[in-house]
């Protein structure tokens, strides 16, 4: 259902020669515990980008939430930032087009840390 809708919007954007900006947000399904997204956030965000980056959706620009939780951030200048950086690099590679980062309700300090990574 959502994929068909996004596909139709992408085709309309092509038809009317307007850019398609798609904002992806992950939420738990109705039968899932609320913490399921937090535990698997990287996988869910990356899977969403992987799907909607396919040419059939015709997305020109993504608005994406961080693929990592605040608790995974650590110090962006420390060695442990490297695995987090890898997740961001994978997200960028999967997107295949420009993307901007959403704050996703995090604090200003944590958003700055995300941007530093």
Where do the language-model regions lie?
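Catalytic-face loop-and-helix region of soluble metabolic enzyme cores
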Residues: 61, 65-117
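Active-site beta->alpha loop and helix N-cap motifs at the rims of alpha/beta catalytic domains
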Residues: 1-21, 29-30
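Charged helix-capping and loop-helix junction motifs
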Residues: 2-6, 45, 80-87
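Generic structural signal for hydrophobic
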Residues: 6-9, 13, 52, 91, ...
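Active-site glycine- and acidic-residue-rich loops that bind
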Residues: 2-4, 33-46, 72, 102-112
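Structural recognition of alpha->loop->beta junctions
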Residues: 37-64, 117
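Active-site-proximal loop/short-helix segments
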Residues: 20-40, 64-72
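Short, well-ordered coil/turn segments that N-cap beta-strands
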Residues: 14-20, 57-60, 95-99
């Amino acid at each position: 259902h959502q994929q068909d809708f996004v596909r139709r919007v992408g085709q309309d954007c092509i038809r009317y020669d307007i850019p398609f900006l798609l904002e992806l947000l992950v939420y738990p399904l109705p039968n899932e515990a609320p913490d399921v997204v937090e535990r698997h956030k990287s996988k869910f965000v990356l899977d969403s980008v992987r799907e909607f980056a396919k040419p059939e959706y015709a997305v020109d620009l993504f608005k994406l939430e961080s693929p990592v939780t605040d608790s995974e951030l650590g110090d962006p200048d420390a060695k442990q930032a490297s695995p987090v950086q890898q997740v961001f690099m994978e997200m960028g590679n999967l997107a295949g087009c420009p993307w901007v980062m959403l704050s996703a309700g995090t604090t200003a300090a944590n958003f700055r840390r995300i941007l530093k990574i």
